[in-house]
Amino acid sequence: MDYDLIVIGSGSVGSAAGYYASQAGLNVLMIDSAMPPHQAGSHHGETRIMRHAYGEGEKYVPLVLRAQALWDQLAAQTGEKLFQACGVINLGPDNSTFLQNVQRSAQQYDLPVETLNSTQIREKWPVFTVPDNYIAVFEPQSGYLRSELAVKTLIKAVTEAGCGILFNCPVTAIESHQAGVDVVTIDGTYSATKVVVTAGTWVKELLPTLPVTPVRKVFSWHQADGRYSEANHFPAFTVEMPDNILYYGFPAQNDALKLGKHHGGQLIESAAQRKPFGRYAEDGTEVFSFLRHFLPGVGVCLRGEACSYDMSPDEDFIIDTLPEDERVMVVSGLSGHGFKFATALGEVAALFAQDKPSPIDISAFSLARFR
């Protein structure tokens, strides 16, 4: 059977691409090397922060606002509570470029934010210990997504829509020819008019020249009492340390607060090198300095997990067709901040499959910037 679209990699972005393409009436085949939602990619670990006033630059704001609207729409259609608006506090030095970008994004797109000095931070969230030169930009309408539930919901929706599913089936090659594009798997070869590659960390196994580097990362849950819960109005957070290293975290649930270090990690070249949490000495200690200085009331590490980032050289996304074949689109290089965008990126991919342009400017994410 020939398909209108084959999606390679059916995690967060891939499942969304399959969903929106099938909603548009396309004949879609979704392929994944595992059985999503799974632990092998970048969508596990229960939650992901949803920020609107974007510290990585205002070019992301139209995309993230579209993603938020689509997440809300999906939640309404399925009855699943995918997003929790607990608010997000962005903390950092008063000269932080990241916070300047947050403020600039909010101003340009008229997003509701509140800027607080260190005294106001301590008054509003007394569990935070902050230096005198720190400020916060609080986003009351932001929060977090339930990432595993979100992927599970998308997979269920595409299955009910009659989308072709080929899971636990690695892809070995993409072959272009005049009549279409062949996707070679261990189960056979499948053909499509268009192909979208959303293969996450291991995309270079299919596209070896793509400028993406896999990095092993970890996050962990720590003992935290009710002061750190949503019931006590404790928000999700990003914190920039004085050395510019960024940490992130979530309100405690069941007395466990999840947090991680955005920077750092271990360069890896294969899935076998993505060792479980605890296999590196720093896994259990890399957040200690942050906790000691900013959240000293948070307790011992209860558990942790490993994941992986697909890092681009500039940590901005790659959303483009391949120079050698414009019938193949790649969405990659999400660099540890991509999950929140999954619905919008999936919509962009589905529009590509219909020969329709993205209504949102994605030119900043083209491969041309690396040439």
UniProtKB/Swiss-Prot annotation:
Its cofactor is FAD. It catalyses: N(alpha)-methyl-L-tryptophan + O2 + H2O = L-tryptophan + formaldehyde + H2O2. Binds 1 FAD per subunit. One of its GO terms (molecular function) is N-methyl-L-amino-acid oxidase activity. The keyword Disulfide bond does not apply. FAD binds at residues 4-34. One of its GO terms (cellular component) is cytosol. The modification S-8alpha-FAD cysteine is found at C307. It comes from the Bacteria. SUPFAM superfamilies: FAD-linked reductases, C-terminal domain, FAD/NAD(P)-binding domain. Its EC number is 1.5.3.-. InterPro entries: FAD-dep_OxRdtase, FAD/NAD-bd_sf, Me_Trp_Oxase_MTOX, MTOX. Keywords: FAD, Flavoprotein, Oxidoreductase. It holds the Pfam family DAO. Catalyzes the oxidative demethylation of N-methyl-L-tryptophan. Monomer. HAMAP family: MTOX. Belongs to the MSOX/MTOX family. MTOX subfamily. This is N-methyl-L-tryptophan oxidase. It comes from Yersinia pestis.
